[in-house]
C-alpha cells in the first residue's frame, strides 16, 4: 500500500532535518559545552554526522584507498565501537594538524581540545589559553611535555622532582631522557610540605642543567599539594620551565586557586590532568593545559605519529551528555562529600583510639593512624578491607627497607618521606562518589576493624595458652562478619 505523504508531512520532515543540522552546526561554530545536556539519541546523531565527513564514510562517492592507512576495519563490532571514526587524530608529527581524508576525526579532536579548555574555565582556570587532549596516561603526558622542551634547553640533564611516592611521575622523567634531582618534603605539624629553599638552591647551583621543576598538586595525605605559587616565582626568576602534575587536582577548589595564583605570580608552562580521574571516562587519556598558546603547539609537535581518537571521543560525548550545569554538579558534590567523609573518619578514629592527620590543603585524601594495630599486621588489615570490597583505600606501613625504582633508592616508599611513623590508612573522596558509597564504606570499615581487633585478641590468647601462633588470616572469615 502506497503511503500517503502530503505537503504538510514533507515540510515537517524538512524541519526536522533543518533542526538537527542547526544544532550540529551551532555546536561546531561555538565549540563550547552546551548549557543543557544532550540525549543519547542526539549523541548518536552527532557521531554519525562527524564520521560522515571522513572520506571512507562518504555517501556521495565510492572511495578508492590507495595508501597504507585508509580507515579499513575488518571486524564490524570494532567498527561500531569506534562509530566509524577510524583514522585517529593529527598527522605524522603534529597532534593539532588536520588530516584531509579524516575531516570528521579532525573535527572531533578540535572539539575535545576546545571542550577541555571550556571545562577548565568553568572550574576556575580562566587564564588557560590552550588545551590538548592526548591518548596518554598522566605519566606519559608529563614525559611528552619534557620531551618537547629538550630543544629549548639543550644543556639540560636533570628535572627537579619534589618527592611524591607514585611511580609514574618518576618514570616519566627517565622516559624523557632526563634524571631526577629528588627533593624530600619537610614536616609542618601533620603535613608534608614543599622544601622551597632547597629547590631554589638547586636551581641556583645547576642553572642550565635543569630542564624543569615538576610539582604535584594531587596526592595522598599526609602529603600536602606542592607550593606551586612559590615554585612558579622561583622558576620565573631563573627562567626555568615549571611542569605541574595535576593528575586529579581539578576536583579541589583550593588546588584550582593555587594553580591560577601560580600563573599570576610566576611561571607555569604546562598543567597535566587525567581524564578518567576528573571527567569519569575510561582510562587512557589526559588533558595538557597551558597559559600560552605556543606552549601547547610545541608539545603537540613533539608527538611522533597519529594518535587514537578514543579519549577525545569519550570526553566530548561525556561533556555533551552532561551540559555545563550537570558537569559542575559533581565537583560541588565532591567538596560536600569530602567534608562529610572527614567528619565520619574523625568520629570513627576517636571511637577506636586513633586520630586523623590535619592536612588542611589536601581536599581529596585523608589519613588515619593505625597505632592500635601492630605494624606487622597492618598490611593484612589492608588486604581484608580490599577483600570486603573497599577499593582504593591504602594501608601505609613504615620500615627502613629500601625500594628501588629506575635506579633510585627510596626508604619508606609509599609514605612520601624517609621519616618513620606508626602506619596509617588512606582513603580518598573523588568526583562521582555517592552518599550510599560513603555510608557503606564506613559500615564495612567499622565491622572489619572490630572483627580484626577481636581476632588479634584471640590470637594473643591462643599464644598465651598454647605457645603456638595461629596466623590471623587462618581465622578471619573473608566472606562473613
Swiss-Prot record:
Subunit structure of this chain's protein: Homotetramer formed by a catalytic dimer and a non-catalytic dimer serving as a binding platform that orients tRNASec for catalysis. Each tetramer binds the CCA ends of two tRNAs which point to the active sites of the catalytic dimer.
Main location group: cytoplasm
One of the GO BP terms on file: conversion of seryl-tRNAsec to selenocys-tRNAsec
Entry function: Converts O-phosphoseryl-tRNA(Sec) to selenocysteinyl-tRNA(Sec) required for selenoprotein biosynthesis.
Residues where substrate binds: 91-92, 99, 306
Enzyme class: transferase
Record-linked NCBIfam families: selenium_SpcS (TIGR03531)
Family membership noted in the UniProt record: Belongs to the SepSecS family.
Transmembrane segments: none
Pathway membership, UniProt: Aminoacyl-tRNA biosynthesis; selenocysteinyl-tRNA(Sec) biosynthesis; selenocysteinyl-tRNA(Sec) from L-seryl-tRNA(Sec) (archaeal/eukaryal route): step 2/2
Organism: Caenorhabditis elegans
EC number: 2.9.1.2
Pfam families the record matches: SepSecS
Encoding gene per record: secs-1
Name of this protein: O-phosphoseryl-tRNA(Sec) selenium transferase
Amino acid at each position: 500500500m502506497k503511503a500517503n505523504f502530503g505537503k504538510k508531512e514533507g515540510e515537517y520532515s524538512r524541519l526536522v532535518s533543518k533542526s538537527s543540522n542547526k544544532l550540529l552546526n551551532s555546536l561546531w561554530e561555538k565549540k563550547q559545552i552546551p548549557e543543557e545536556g544532550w540525549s543519547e539519541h542526539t549523541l548518536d546523531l552527532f557521531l554519525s554526522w562527524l564520521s560522515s565527513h571522513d572520506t571512507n564514510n562518504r555517501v556521495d562517492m565510492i572511495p578508492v584507498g590507495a595508501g597504507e592507512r585508509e580507515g579499513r576495519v575488518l571486524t564490524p563490532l570494532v567498527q561500531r565501537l569506534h562509530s566509524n571514526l577510524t583514522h585517529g587524530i593529527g598527522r605524522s608529527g603534529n597532534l593539532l594538524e588536520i588530516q584531509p581524508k579524516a575531516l570528521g576525526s579532525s573535527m572531533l579532536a578540535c572539539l575535545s581540545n576546545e571542550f577541555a579548555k571550556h571545562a577548565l574555565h568553568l572550574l576556575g582556570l580562566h587564564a588557560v589559553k590552550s588545551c590538548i587532549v592526548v591518548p596518554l596516561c598522566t605519566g606519559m603526558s608529563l614525559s611528552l611535555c619534557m620531551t618537547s622542551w629538550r630543544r629549548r634547553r639543550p644543556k639540560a640533564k636533570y628535572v627537579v622532582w619534589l618527592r611524591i611516592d607514585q611511580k609514574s611521575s618518576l618514570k616519566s622523567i627517565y622516559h624523557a631522557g632526563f634524571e631526577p634531582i629528588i627533593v624530600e618534603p619537610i614536616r609542618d605539624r601533620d603535613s608534608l610540605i614543599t622544601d622551597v629553599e632547597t629547590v631554589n638552591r638547586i636551581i641556583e647551583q645547576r642553572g642550565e642543567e635543569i630542564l624543569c621543576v615538576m610539582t604535584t598538586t594531587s596526592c595522598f595525605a599526609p602529603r600536602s599539594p606542592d607550593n606551586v605559587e612559590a615554585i612558579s616565582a622561583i622558576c620565573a626568576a631563573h627562567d626555568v620551565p615549571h611542569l605541574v602534575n595535576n593528575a586529579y587536582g581539578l576536583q579541589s577548589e583550593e588546588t584550582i586557586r593555587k594553580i591560577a595564583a601560580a600563573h599570576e605570580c610566576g611561571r607555569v608552562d604546562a598543567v597535566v590532568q587525567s581524564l578518567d580521574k576528573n571527567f569519569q571516562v575510561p582510562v587512557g587519556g589526559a588533558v595538557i593545559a597551558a597559559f600560552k598558546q605556543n606552549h601547547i603547539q610545541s608539545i603537540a609537535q613533539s608527538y611522533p605519529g597519529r594518535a587514537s581518537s578514543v579519549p577525545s571521543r569519550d570526553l566530548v560525548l561525556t561533556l555533551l551528555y552532561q551540559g555545563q550545569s550537570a558537569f559542575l554538579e559533581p565537583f560541588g558534590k565532591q567538596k560536600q562529600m569530602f567534608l562529610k567523609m572527614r567528619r565520619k573518619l574523625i568520629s570513627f578514629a576517636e571511637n577506636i583510639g586513633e586520630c586523623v592527620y590535619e592536612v588542611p590543603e589536601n581536599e581529596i585524601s585523608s589519613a588515619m593512624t593505625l597505632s592500635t594495630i601492630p605494624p606487622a599486621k597492618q598490611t593484612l588489615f589492608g588486604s581484608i578491607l580490599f577483600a570486603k570490597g573497599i577499593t582504593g583505600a591504602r594501608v601505609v606501613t613504615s620500615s627502613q627497607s629500601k625500594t628501588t625504582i629506575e635506579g633510585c633508592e627510596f626508604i619508606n616508599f609509599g609514605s612520601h618521606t624517609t621519616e618513620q611513623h606508626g602506619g596509617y590508612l588512606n582513603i580518598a573522596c573523588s568526583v562521582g562518589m555517592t552518599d550510599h558509597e560513603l555510608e557503606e564504606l564506613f559500615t564495612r570499615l567499622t565491622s572489619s576493624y572490630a572483627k580484626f581487633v577481636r581476632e588479634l585478641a584471640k590470637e594473643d590468647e591462643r599464644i598465651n595458652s598454647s605457645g603456638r601462633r595461629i596466623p590471623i588470616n587462618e581465622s578471619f572469615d573473608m566472606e562473613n562478619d
